[in-house]
Amino acid sequence: MAAASSVSSPPLCLAGRVAIVTGSSRGIGRAIAIHLAELGARVVVNYSTSPVEAEKVATAITTNCSKDAEVAGKSPRVIVVKADISEPSQVKSLFDEAERVFESPVHILVNSAAIADPNHSTISDMSVELFDRIISVNTRGAFICAREAANRLKRGGGGRIILLSTSLVQTLNTNYGSYTASKAAVEAMAKILAKELKGTEITVNCVSPGPVATEMFYTGLSNEIVEKVKSQNLFGRIGETKDIAPVVGFLASDAGEWINGQVIMANGGCLL
């Protein structure tokens, strides 16, 4: 019988691969960065405004992730890079730094960086300035990152572009107009890019989480609304970041190669 530790340890299916995870200093991005590292990837933890939190993620990866022989000698396992994904020059530098430090092309891009309206304004009440900022980070940023990845990811197998979306694109809840619009554009762009990358063996997919217990989710919501959201889920709870990270890990692995140009919904059954 195999030892218990061998059962609980994830296979190092991403050993030798380099992954950039934008917006990975906190929330879903943080969980994804740690999970990809657990699968053997060397990871770029990207942040824009949270350096302390980003360094904590890097420390968690360095301290807790496998020292297996498959990844031994490939040091460092993780680096922290500041970049505003809405700025093309900073995204280019993000990829440059990954290639320089890891001495390898990037294999995996996960675009998790995003912002939302903390006041949950209606479309009629939202300022143009806030709308522009949300589109700049969520849509323009996803475009800039995906464009850079399309030109620089390893071809011929193992290349993955994974963009985070939201179940709001399907539910069309009021008071989330700008955020929903920004992510609907990302889903359309991902499908088109998948077609444009035909023949490269680079896959492009979206992961569309339902409500997940993050700071961004809870901001501006009353306890009454949170309880209502829980009741709408078949599990009777809010999703957690650990529910989303393995979905991304699967898409990033060789096992997920046949999934391409898709929007994968991960919401515990709150949307059927």
Curated annotation (Swiss-Prot):
Family, as annotated: Belongs to the short-chain dehydrogenases/reductases (SDR) family.
Transit peptide range per the UniProt entry: 1-53
UniProt keyword annotation of Signal present: no
One Pfam assignment: adh_short_C2
Cited Gene3D superfamilies: NAD(P)-binding Rossmann-like Domain (3.40.50.720)
Amino acids binding NADP(+): 26-50
Subcellular location per the Swiss-Prot or TrEMBL entry: Plastid, Chloroplast
Gene Ontology MF terms in the entry: alcohol dehydrogenase (NADP+) activity
Source species of the chain: Arabidopsis thaliana
GO cellular component: chloroplast
Protein name: NADPH-dependent aldehyde reductase 2, chloroplastic
